[in-house]
Amino acid sequence: MHPLMSAAPKISFVSLGCPKALVDSERILTHLRAEGYELARKHDGADVVIVNTCGFLDSAKAESLQAIGEAMAENGRVIVTGCMGAQPEEIRERYPNLLAVTGPQAYESVVAAVHEAVPPAHDPYLDLVPPQGVKLTPRHYAYLKISEGCNNRCTFCIIPSLRGDLVSRPAGDVLREAEKLVKAGVKELLVISQDTSAYGVDLRYAASPWRDGEVRARFVDLARALGELGVWVRLHYVYPYPHVDEVIPLMAEGKVLPYLDMPLQHASPSVLRRMRRPANQEKMLERIRGWRSVCPDLAIRSTFIVGFPGETEAEFEELLSWLAEAKLERVGCFPYEPVRGAAANEVAPPVPDEVKAERYRRFMEAQAAVSLRLQRAKVGKRLPVIIDEAGPTVARGRSKSDAPEIDGSVHVASRRPVRAGDIVTVKIERADTYDLHGIAV
């Protein structure tokens, strides 16, 4: 061993929760990898374990506590960070011997805790970090976080109390990170935040340098600039503010993917008011029709909550009726789960669990029928598909209408070899409720 080198300390890492937390994990790991730390595959082979927790729902907290317990049992030297870290008393009560507990976005505190537990062993002769940093996603796609926090105060959500108000990154910084990812081989950028369409409001839409000019910290301006990088750009967590209309022409022009992830949560005006969400869903239907007239290939993904406190059968029927008329391409649904500290717990009496379960079943059955009709309409069409997983005879990929992890897949038979990250044209031959099947042409 060279005299300036010593054995590299090893870190085991657990990342729980949403894609935004995954980006936090990538940032922490990139920093530590640059300092010479190595990643261990198992807890018992590491010098320290970091657990990035989720604290949004009680079930997520339970999963986080279980992960911490497993790390303590298998290793015993554990640092906790993430959203649940904003409530350290609850964690310390269960696990008093943790090395450190830090809150969300506390990158420097996590790194400092690692330094204290196991100091870095620098190796000046190795380039330890790839150009795109340490990524926890496959090489061909990456999450691009453009802001932290949220200015909304939805009654079912405690994110602002965990992550604070909206803090946007300068547009130039976002674009430089995106360009770096593209140069490293990323073919798809998934734009994320707590509230993507509010991007830049805290910066008063200030301009920042980018290439030979400037770009403003504004949702549409950023989307347009990202669209010039020559890769798929997918927009997530978009609230239906009026200026969202301006991004639809970019989708029609092929600058960004014709895909809009827009969490609408419900359709009954009275439920939406209890949620403190925009309540004019009739106008929302008009806007969706307008968007589709501009961009016929638009796929809208949304999530809904059933069994919200006080939800009546009539209010639930309003949701089903709206869903049938909207004909959304991609839909997720969750029975309401109480969140400690959320205002929703006090707005109305809870809906019984058995009623929530029954409404969830009816919702999913109704949407499955819509989804199957929309999927069958694609049979015979030729679609571009990005390959996620290559196989000996059949590969698995996604169309422009499908985000990783949350949407369906396209199963691709191909006579020629394909690799993860390839974008191939596929003739669709068969459709299921959520997946498509076809052959590469």
Curated annotation (Swiss-Prot):
Key word 4Fe-4S present: yes
Ranges of residues in domain MTTase N-terminal: 9-119
Keyword Thylakoid assigned: no
Keywords, sorted A to Z: 4Fe-4S, Cytoplasm, Iron, Iron-sulfur, Metal-binding, S-adenosyl-L-methionine, Transferase
Known EC number: 2.8.4.4
Ranges of residues in domain TRAM: 376-441
Positions of disulphide bridges: none
Cofactors: [4Fe-4S] cluster
Cofactor note: Binds 2 [4Fe-4S] clusters. One cluster is coordinated with 3 cysteines and an exchangeable S-adenosyl-L-methionine.
Binding site for [4Fe-4S] cluster 1: 18, 54, 83
Annotated localization: Cytoplasm
Pfam families to which the protein is assigned, alphabetical: Radical_SAM, TRAM_2, UPF0004
Class in the EC hierarchy, top level: transferase
Binding site for [4Fe-4S] cluster 2: 150, 154, 157
Span of domain Radical SAM core: 136-373
GO molecular function: 4 iron, 4 sulfur cluster binding; aspartic acid methylthiotransferase activity; metal ion binding; protein methylthiotransferase activity
GO biological process entries: tRNA modification
Protein task: Catalyzes the methylthiolation of an aspartic acid residue of ribosomal protein uS12.
Protein family according to the UniProt entry: Belongs to the methylthiotransferase family. RimO subfamily.
Entry-linked NCBIfam families: 30S ribosomal protein S12 methylthiotransferase RimO, MiaB/RimO family radical SAM methylthiotransferase
PANTHER family: RIBOSOMAL PROTEIN S12 METHYLTHIOTRANSFERASE RIMO (PTHR43837), RIBOSOMAL PROTEIN US12 METHYLTHIOTRANSFERASE RIMO (PTHR43837:SF1)
Protein name, as recorded: Ribosomal protein uS12 methylthiotransferase RimO
Lineage: Bacteria, Pseudomonadati, Pseudomonadota, Alphaproteobacteria, Hyphomicrobiales
